[in-house]
């Protein structure tokens, strides 16, 4: 094991000089062996020549000084994997941070791995029911697929994510891995207690690298979580992998890239944006042995979907759930935009003709309503034809019926959460489209589960 000395420190970036004949490889983990920060891990990012390597620190560099001895471990960062990680909260290095003692003697794996080869990969078209009406209807998820939840600040990405985890973990009863990448510590804490109260904590591994962590931690924590998910997949399981938030992964890459002295590209992002995203996303794949279904929250800066970060993420996904500020401002939650959200599964050969026709019918009615909004604003409803009046009335009912009370929001709303099966979702929307509920007031459709509840609610109004 070779030893080197710290020669330069620039924020989270540390340069270390090794003997010329034993320079560490790219991605090798190095460890500080003396001083206040003994045990601090550094990851090699560049070889500068002359025996000097440039590393990124996975922890604070406050108190680091030149001349300290550094050991080369000779391998990439190794994190614990397997059943010992379930029910535990870990940091980027796999160390427990939940004060529940050490993680049992388990297998360790490198966080840097190759993506599965073409021969090993498998594609499935089996649907994953989420119990959330708008998602199951308009942008259905595939088992083993990749889903992105896109939204600006405060439109409900994390709440939607928590509801999906709760519904799928309880109904699907598989293992899940949750990677908290650069999000609020409070949300991580809420999430832990939510899982504990729902009695699904023993099926979830939690890996956190929160907002206050150095950029190295936030950049690598997604890979740590992914490695744990890959292990479950390779054991032949169907595993769920949740990332909140993919944008912070990109942002950490931007910070690291600037510190490493690379020229920034568009909007100040790193020049390697597409490649860094690809390295992560290509590993999130299903193989012939098991599947990884991944659900990722994607922050959209300034609500601009054409920003390079969300735009790069779009290319990798099978389904996109777009959360809209306009819909949230109407008080309709989940604030999913049914006209902007897409899914590759929305195909009659996959979901069946009835589901497809209902989804497209809902979209066309909502699209017509959107087109008529200007006319209504200027001339009022009375100027519309009878047909258009009916369309608008149905569209407003559909819009309200797309809302749904969440289990994870019970404490705030006071109304119990609802899980709606796909069959009930389709029959409800089909009924509205066919005019079976034209006589009910539109308020009856707001924040209910199935269509029967809307009919019950109408009787009390």
Swiss-Prot record:
UniProt keyword terms in alphabetical order: ATP synthesis, ATP-binding, Cell inner membrane, Cell membrane, CF(1), Hydrogen ion transport, Ion transport, Membrane, Nucleotide-binding, Translocase, Transport
InterPro entries: AAA+_ATPase, ATP-synt_VA_C, ATP_synth_F1_bsu, ATPase_a/bsu_AS, ATPase_alpha/beta_chains, ATPase_F1/V1/A1_a/bsu_N, ATPase_F1/V1/A1_a/bsu_N_sf, ATPase_F1/V1/A1_a/bsu_nucl-bd
Catalytic activity line of the entry: ATP + H2O + 4 H(+)(in) = ADP + phosphate + 5 H(+)(out)
Entry annotated with the keyword Membrane: yes
One protein family per Pfam: ATP-synt_ab_N
UniProt KW Cell membrane keyword: yes
Membrane topology: Peripheral membrane protein
Record Gene3D superfamilies: 2.40.10.170, Bovine Mitochondrial F1-atpase, Atp Synthase Beta Chain, Chain D, domain 3 (1.10.1140.10), P-loop containing nucleotide triphosphate hydrolases (3.40.50.300)
NCBIfam families referenced in this protein's UniProt entry, alphabetically: atpD
Quaternary structure annotation from Swiss-Prot or TrEMBL: F-type ATPases have 2 components, CF(1) - the catalytic core - and CF(0) - the membrane proton channel. CF(1) has five subunits: alpha(3), beta(3), gamma(1), delta(1), epsilon(1). CF(0) has three main subunits: a(1), b(2) and c(9-12). The alpha and beta chains form an alternating ring which encloses part of the gamma chain. CF(1) is attached to CF(0) by a central stalk formed by the gamma and epsilon chains, while a peripheral stalk is formed by the delta and b chains.
Assigned protein family: Belongs to the ATPase alpha/beta chains family.
Protein name according to UniProt: ATP synthase subunit beta 2
Organism: Pseudoalteromonas atlantica (strain T6c / ATCC BAA-1087)
Gene behind the chain: atpD2
